[in-house]
């Protein structure tokens, strides 16, 4: 998911002054990526303190939503946190964000093979998951899901095969499915 999230972050066209809201439970390398690009592009990466324990999903949603402002354009959260194994109520967050026009980017690194995953039910704008953790796939096996209406805004991190002519009818897949030889 690190590569997938970096691909997404690099593609964002947030205006200076806008905010990405996250939590203080996120994975370190992705926090660093958000901080790097927010400084480079002039938007703010805000980490909401989420004290634990919380008593319900609604308690979590209400606490997290206190961090949303009129400048919040993106919410970035883990589905299952790396450090504590907490399962965040992502479906509820995504539903509320969608109703308010906020894009959701979900780091599901620890989800595939660990708990049930139904992206259609969760309905995030962007979701990524690691297949090498609980599915025992080769290291680096990851997927990136992007809602169709946002795919045209996601540029490949590495340009290689597929960026010009490929048999897939979906340009997003052409540009991102194969990133060349790793050497």
Residue ranges, per PLM feature:
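Active-site PLP attachment segment
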Residues: 122-170
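A short glycine-threonine-serine/GTX helix/turn-capping micro-motif
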Residues: 169-183
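Structural detector of well-ordered beta-strand residues that form the stable sheet scaffold
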Residues: 21, 46, 105-107, 128, ...
């Amino acid at each position: 998911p690190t590569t997938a999230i970096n691909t997404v972050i690099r593609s964002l066209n947030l205006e200076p002054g806008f905010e990405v809201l996250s939590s203080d439970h996120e994975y370190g390398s992705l926090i660093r990526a958000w901080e790097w690009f927010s400084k480079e592009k002039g938007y703010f990466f805000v980490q909401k303190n989420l004290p634990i324990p919380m008593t319900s999903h609604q308690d979590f949603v209400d606490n997290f939503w206190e961090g949303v402002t009129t400048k919040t354009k993106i919410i970035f959260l883990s589905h299952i946190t790396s450090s504590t194994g907490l399962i965040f109520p992502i479906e509820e967050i995504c539903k509320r964000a969608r109703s308010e026009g906020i894009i959701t980017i979900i780091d599901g690194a620890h989800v595939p093979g660990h708990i049930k995953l139904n992206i259609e039910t969760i309905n995030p704008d962007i979701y990524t998951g690691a297949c090498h953790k609980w599915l025992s796939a080769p290291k680096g096996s990851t997927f990136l899901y992007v809602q169709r209406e946002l795919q045209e805004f996601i540029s490949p991190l590495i340009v290689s095969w597929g960026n010009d002519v490929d048999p897939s009818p979906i340009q997003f897949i052409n540009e991102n499915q194969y990133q060349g030889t790793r050497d």
